[in-house]
Amino acid sequence: MKKRIDYLSNKQNKYSIRRFTVGTTSVIVGATILFGIGNHQAQASEQSNDTTQSSKNNASADSEKNNMIETPQLNTTANDTSDISANTNSANVDSTAKPMSTQTSNTTTTEPASTNETPQLTAIKDQATAAKMQDQTVPQEANSQVDNKTTNDANSIATNSELKNPQTLDLPQSSPQTISNAQGTSKPSVRTRAVRSLAVAEPVVNAADAKGTNVNDKVTAKDFQLEKTTFDPNQSGNTFMAANFTVTGQVKSGDYFTAKLPDSVTGNGDVDYSNSNNTMPIADIVNDKNEVVAKATYDILTKTYTFVFTDYVNDKQNINGKFSLPLFTDRAKAPKSGTYDANINIADEMFNNKITYNYSSPIAGIDKPNGANISSQIIGVDTASGQNTYKQTVFVNPKQRVLGNTWVYIKGYQDKIEESSGKVSATDTKLRIFEVNDTSKLSDSYYADPNDSNLKEVTDQFKDKITYKYQNVASINFGDINKTYVVLVEGHYDKTGKNLKTQVIQENVDPATGKDYSIFGWNNENVVRYGGGSADGDSAVNPKDPTPGPPVDPEPSPDPEPEPSPDPDPEPTPDPEPSPDPDPDSDSDSDSGSDSDSDSDSDSDSDSDSGSDSDSDSDSDSESDSESDSDSDSESDSDSDSDSESDSDSDSDSDSDSDSDSDSDSDSDSDSDSDSDSDSDSESDSDSDSDSESDSDSDSDSDSDSDSDSDSDSDSDSDSDSDSDSDSESDSDSDSDSDSDSDSDSDSDSDSDSDSDSDSDSDSDSESDSDSDSDSDSDSDSDSDSDSDSDSDSDSDSDSESDSDSDSDSDSDSDSDSDSDSDSDSDSDSDSRVTPPNNEQKAPSNPKGEVNHSNKVSKQHKTDALPETGDKSENTNATLFGAMMALLGSLLLFRKRKQDHKEKA
């Protein structure tokens, strides 16, 4: 596709021709004055000069217009799509920036963390007696983010339908050892059956009193291992420590040894034993016959395990055993993600380790400027004292966005009230609300110290904004906010035996528009971890070294996917007889970030979009044709008119687009596009104009040969063949006059030059030159050309094109050689006639109202009588003035010819 710069060059050539024409006119006028023509003719001549100058200005304006048309039009399609939170499960209905014909509801359902069992540590077997540990099942949580359903009515929360992701867990009947929070992950929700819940906690059984002696000096620990050293505590992550131990010498009932944990680690996880004397029972260490070898407890405050031997050891020697205990993060002492020292002391022997906590970020929500964002974590559950309390931390607007009409709902259930033991009411729930000064200082572990200077308590400001209107739901009206808040929840759960499940939801709108409704939710549930140990001894006098068990795999095995149960409702099974030994405990947390997002909203925006049509633009494809341009020569012009139709379309802008297609030259077809604006493509035709230039060939004036030509000139278009002219370029000079016609063809111009030779005959043509015509031609042609091309383009653009063509005309001018002809001015050229029709057709497309300097201008001057100005008296100065004008014109003419000669050289 030719670049528009060709047309600009042609415009410049055209302008040169006109200057030359002005010089020629000056010579003629000067000569006329010299020979004694009256002053009133001189004034009329000046008027003609003004007209010529006006034409020049119009030519410049045409060039400017073509520049404007050629300026690439960047049609930016704003594809406003609904925000979809990839890893948050939300129903996000977002208003697009432009009205859309339909509202798109994008609902992303996340998947839950797979459930898996922590690998069991193989019990150590002695060659004489196998001391078997009371192995405990370690179920992994099956938590997930919620499958949130968008709702525009806050009241619907009470219907339990907006968030669906019930999660229950398989927990063994024995006492819970530790509980860990299961946070929402990115996998689809699953249901697992719950056979027991945190509510059915065994009463604490006091361990054997450590009345004897500390025998750490007689106990040797070995084969210490951590199951893993990196995990995410916010995703119910934890590790296990395992060690073998042997007792040297005799020990008796009541003797004990200890193990101590570092600050960054805890043995109770998220289970709260503050109401149970800060003591957590540990599973007994038993032998193969289920005889208790030692009892154990864990002191929450000192983080110390105490293993107290029973009567079983009184007559035993070579006592050896092993234990495996779960370890968790200490959320207060390790508040941020990172690597911490985890040096564990067992029987006064230090085992140095490091543990890395990769907390899932608590800053979660819909990824858009006014998206709801909230998360929570259950950080303490009392499973032992019978008070059935729990503590929960909620981060509201952790992304610190500017939100309008913000509501937060804290629920004691997730999907169905009857599936959770949570109790949320004015009597069962205490809420404390804090404003965060610096969000970056929030902990990753969800630990929040009420005495922290970064937190400012504002609970009193919300006294009238906290309601319990819906069953098992606390509603908090935050209104318009731009800060982050922490809500500390102290709640209760009942004794129904169901799992404790909670959910928090935030909903808000864009404060600027009152629209763009967004909702995001987060689920929490608790998971139990178990630990225990085994030991034995023998009565043989000759001790035997214990055979160490296989080493613990430090890397956890991949989590198996839980089998989704078709039964949505958990079926709690009756609790079996409680076992006499106190069982380990649990670590609770669970959280699943269910994002309920749903921008649902607003989008209702009436999507008027009728705009869809715009698509039609696509036609622009026609561009490809552009090549066809070449054809344009075929003068398919006839079609040209067809363009007009395309104009009809959308015209205005469409055109602009059409510009793009210029290629469509292939044109006429492109017309079809016209409808779709695609026409705009046609504009691109302007390039096609270039073809039109081939028309210009007509200039080739080859006709010129025919001399008759001049008129034929008009036909000359048919000459388009003239292309052949191109050859003769050398001639360029000879009178390309005919050019005038050729004008139109600007491109051919180059050829025309060649023709011009033939012209030499054509001088006669010079008549035809009627340079003035040429001007007109330029316009006209442009049009005509354009037509032809445009025709092809028919694309509405044609108009624009016509302009562009005009450029092409300019080329023809380039034939400037025609200058020589310039004299002939006779204008007789019928050519001018040819163009005017096109000009007339194209006139409406002239957006700036420029005057097309076509043959019509020349005719007007020829037919209108010169005004009677001045008097008829002879003025002697006229002769002198005429001579000067003639001389000046001659100089201008000579200078121009010299320049032309240099350029051709």
UniProtKB/Swiss-Prot annotation:
Renumbered to this chain, region (Disordered) spans 44-191, 530-877
**Gene3D superfamilies xref list:** 2.60.40.1280, 2.60.40.1290
Region annotation (Ligand binding A region) ranges: 45-542
**Location in the cell:** Secreted, Cell wall
Annotated membrane topology is: Peptidoglycan-anchor
Q: Compositional bias (Pro residues) spans?
A: 545-555
- What's the main place this protein lives? secreted
What the entry says about post-translational processing? Proteolytically cleaved by aureolysin (aur). This cleavage leads to the inactivation of ClfB.
Q: Where is this site: Cleavage?
A: S197, L198, A199, V200
Give me any GO biological process, just one. Answer: cell adhesion
Query: Where is the PTM Pentaglycyl murein peptidoglycan amidated threonine found along the chain?
Result: T869
Keyword vocabulary terms for this entry:
Cell wall, Peptidoglycan-anchor, Secreted, Signal, Virulence
List the biased-composition ranges (Basic and acidic residues). Answer: 861-874
Q: List where the motif YSIRK-G/S signaling motif lies.
A: 15-26
Q: Which residues form the propeptide?
A: 870-905
- One annotated Gene Ontology cellular component of this protein: extracellular region
Q: Quick one: signal sequence residues?
A: 1-44
Task: Give residue numbers for sequence motif LPXTG sorting signal.
Answer: 866-870
Q: Which residue stretches does the UniProt record annotate as biased composition, category Acidic residues? A: 556-829
Q: Where is the composition biased (Low complexity)?
A: 102-119
Q: Where is this motif: MIDAS-like motif?
A: 272-276
Instruction: Quote the function comment for this protein.
Output: Cell surface-associated protein implicated in virulence by promoting bacterial attachment to both alpha- and beta-chains of human fibrinogen and inducing the formation of bacterial clumps.
Q: Which family does it belong to?
A: Belongs to the serine-aspartate repeat-containing protein (SDr) family.
Q: What is known of its domains?
A: The Asp/Ser-rich domain functions as a stalk to allow the ligand binding domain to be displayed in a functional form on the cell surface.
**Name of this protein:** Clumping factor B
What is the organism of origin for this protein? Staphylococcus aureus (strain MSSA476)
Give the gene symbol.
clfB
